[in-house]
Amino acid sequence: MSETSFDVIIIGSGPGGYVTAIRASQLGFKTAIIEKEDLGGVCLNWGCIPTKALLRSAEVYHNMQHAADYGLSASPQFDLKAIVARSRKIAGQLSGGIKHLMKKNKVTVIAGFATLKAGQDAPIVIVDGTDYTAKHVILATGARARSIPQAGLEPDGKFIWTAREAMVPDTMPKKLLVIGSGAIGMEFASFYDAFGADVTVVEMVDRILPAEDAEISKMARKAFEKRGLTIKTETQASVKAGAQGVTATLTSKGKSETAEFDRVILAVGIVGNVEDMGLEALGVKIDRSHITVDEYSFTGVKGLYAIGDVTTPPWLAHKASHEGIICIEKIAGGNPHPLDANAIPGCTYCHPQVASVGYTEAQAKEAGYDIKVGRFPFIGNGKAIALGEPEGLIKTIFDTKSGELLGAHMIGAEVTELIQGYTVAQKLETTEHELMETVFPHPTLSEMMHEAVLDAYDRTIHF
């Protein structure tokens, strides 16, 4: 093959793209990956990883402020510039790690913006005037923040921010408006609140974290309001930037109020990066800025596939990675199981953390299941008390007939690390009896996972 001819070309190097490239190389494909910015995509450079670095700084600062609770003394101060610099350093370090992985796995990296035109086996990929050919082309172009210009909800890089601007603030805003209460919105609300900003969160529907179980959402709201956040649900926002800040009009149930804010963060969803690549001319089906694909990520256009945020929800990094592996293994002639969207865990890294997998209680009932529900509070767990984290809940949902674990929902310290236990249990179709008979180590937070199963069958021990 020539330097412009490959077995597989992947466009986009986020967690969908680079993972797929590595697996393609492992399967023996001559592979290239095309990236217009930094290796690692939005997730690694401007999303998942750097936000966790910021939130870690917020967590440490919060703990220092409460040092007396642990028999310690501290007079903490924060250096915003240093906090941001640490986050950026980590992103840069990991992007460099992806570069190393590409070299190690003999993946050719091509820098630039890719467009497509019709080809023989698959679309021809054009970068900076050079044609690249492959038998299979995989789109992993990701997504960007959604804007609503008619309501003034359009980033200006100064007063009205997307997540990217919110990650690199020059100063800490005194008053901050966060529009949207999904994972992105609540993580930034948690970060800025920790460092003293007066944060207001606006959500159109009747509860924050609307994708989560209603009971967990209610507990999250209570915890955030206890920390001092103002939360307005069933509220729409329109904003107008001025010389020194933003005037927001907040409307709920026909009544409007105006308020002034230093900054606004838009967290009202995402749109797929599908523009200016020539997809429409190829006949790619696009629904509301996201590409329609089948269970193996095939677009319907010969040799063309799409994975990750540019396709259908849930829009999660780990879903993109897994989709990519399924896609390339299918291309290689394997018979991988299609991805079960209901078995993908979701995590929100605010304080308190929120995590879930499977059906919510309402969804399970709507699906026609007769269910048993178990609950166990953090206050009943010795490790949680020792950590100084007594607020939280683990909730389980079982099918009464089969004993199948239908869903699990958590709020509290480190639940984003606990949820995978239930995810594995779901994948292995573990029954309630098998979970109840499993030995959990003591003292750990994971014991609550056991107790939440026991509670569904009236056998809980410690509460």
Predicted regions and their residues:
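FAD-site-proximal beta/loop scaffold in flavoenzymes
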Residues: 156-172, 258-333
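Glycine-rich flavin
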Residues: 2-6, 22-29, 34-172, 200, ...
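Flexible, glycine-rich terminal cap/loop adjacent to redox cofactors
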Residues: 9-37, 49, 53-60, 332-333, ...
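Gly/Ala-rich phosphate-binding loop of Rossmann-like dinucleotide-binding domains
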Residues: 21, 25, 189, 193-194
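Hydrophobic/small residue at the entry helix of a nucleotide-binding pocket
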Residues: 16, 40, 184
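A structured beta-alpha segment of the ubiquitous adenosine-cofactor-binding alpha/beta core
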Residues: 127-130, 237, 249-258, 270
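Short hydrophobic core segments
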Residues: 9-11, 114, 132-142, 179, ...
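Beta1/beta-strand and adjacent pyrophosphate-binding region of the FAD-binding site
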Residues: 2-14, 172-179
